[in-house]
Amino acid sequence: LQIALQTKIKLFYRPAAIKTRPNEVWQDQLILNKVSGGYRIENPTPYYVTVIGLGGSEKQAEEGEFETVMLSPRSEQTVNRNYNTPYLSYINDYGGRPVLSFICNGSRCSVKKEK
């Protein structure tokens, strides 16, 4: 009997100059720009963001097929998905998988702020 396991662990160091406060959600600064055939995800923050889902509903963002995207600080990446009301799922600092809801105004979509 032979069992093989493969595990990936990502470790990031945050310099003191960009440390966050506990429970601070900075991922809500992400911006989706509509482009031909999909979205360009823009990360204006000084942090890495791992996007694990993009869908037309919260459930689709959580469970749908999506190739994970790692966004570097102050970078952008294009994904070939197109939805009227996009939802984005990411991995937070605690391993959780929150979902962000976006509101689009023209070709620019920003996170819908919770009240």
UniProtKB/Swiss-Prot annotation:
Keyword annotations of the record: Chaperone, Fimbrium biogenesis, Immunoglobulin domain, Periplasm
Keyword Ligase included in the entry's annotation: no
InterPro entries: Ig-like_fold, Periplasmic_pilus_chap, Pili_assmbl_chap_C_dom_sf, Pili_assmbl_chaperone_C
One Pfam family recorded for the sequence: PapD_C
UniProt subcellular location: Periplasm
Superkingdom assignment: Bacteria
Cross-referenced SUPFAM superfamilies: Periplasmic chaperone C-domain
Gene Ontology CC terms: periplasmic space
Main location (coarse class): periplasm
Family: Belongs to the periplasmic pilus chaperone family.
Biological role: Mediates assembly of pili by forming soluble multimeric complexes with pili subunits as an intermediate step in the assembly process.
Name by which UniProt lists this protein: Chaperone protein PrsD
Name of the gene this protein is made from: prsD
